[in-house]
Curated annotation (Swiss-Prot):
One of its GO terms (cellular component) is cytoplasm. PANTHER family: TRNA-SPLICING ENDONUCLEASE SUBUNIT SEN2 (PTHR21227:SF0). Keywords: Lyase, tRNA processing. Endonuclease that removes tRNA introns. Cleaves pre-tRNA at the 5'- and 3'-splice sites to release the intron. The products are an intron and two tRNA half-molecules bearing 2',3' cyclic phosphate and 5'-OH termini. Recognizes a pseudosymmetric substrate in which 2 bulged loops of 3 bases are separated by a stem of 4 bp. The keyword tRNA processing applies. GO terms for molecular function: endonuclease activity; lyase activity; nucleic acid binding; tRNA-intron endonuclease activity. Homotetramer; although the tetramer contains four active sites, only two participate in the cleavage. Therefore, it should be considered as a dimer of dimers. The active site is at Y115, H125, K156. Belongs to the tRNA-intron endonuclease family. Archaeal short subfamily. Its EC number is 4.6.1.16. This is tRNA-splicing endonuclease. The gene is endA.
């Protein structure tokens, strides 16, 4: 695992559908890299973010018995808590690896919000809303139109991420065009 410049692993505690970090130094390091959301005196990470950070070797997650969970153990837990976890994790990992800043898109009915590489997220808005689908999914054209309209109404573009059975991802950039 690559530790990059994080040094010692940061400890988080599994709490339902999120992982909580209380260590001030850990909060500072992770929030500076745009992971999680600072909520008072702690940082809240999504399960997808926590899995990604465990995979990087930056985070260890503890549960009830205070024993660190492996990536596989957290993954199995998270699959029972979050729909389409595997697909979302693959897309999150791919986008983060490409240098994008990825945040939750829940408030917009999307899986993620995507910021440009190097964006100052305190001063700039996200550019894309990302919706993740398995390759074999289907939806009505009216549903797709609805996704695009929501993105347009909040001045964002829609990125549809299609994940195939091998874990390969194809992205489709959708924009609203007024006839």
């Amino acid at each position: 695992m690559v530790r990059d410049k994080m040094g010692k692993k940061i400890t988080g505690l599994l709490d339902g559908d999120r992982v909580i970090v209380f260590d001030k130094n850990g909060i500072s390091k992770l929030s500076a890299r745009h992971y999680g959301n600072v909520e008072g005196n702690f940082l809240s990470l999504s399960l997808v973010e926590a899995l990604y950070l465990i995979n990087l070797g930056w985070l260890e997650v503890k549960y009830k018995d205070n024993k660190p969970l492996s990536f596989e153990e957290l993954y199995e837990y998270a699959r029972n808590v979050e729909e389409r976890l595997c697909l979302k994790y693959l897309v999150y990992k791919d986008l983060r690896t490409r240098g994008y800043i990825v945040k939750t898109g829940l408030k917009y009915g999307a899986d993620f919000r995507l910021y440009e590489r190097g964006a100052n997220i305190d001063k700039e808005h996200s550019v894309y809303l990302v919706k993740v689908f398995p390759e074999d999914s289907s939806f009505l054209l009216s549903e797709l139109t609805g996704f695009v309209r929501v993105a347009h109404s909040v001045r964002k573009k829609l990125l549809i991420a299609i994940v195939d059975a091998d874990g390969d991802i194809v992205y489709y950039n959708m924009t609203y065009v007024k006839p």
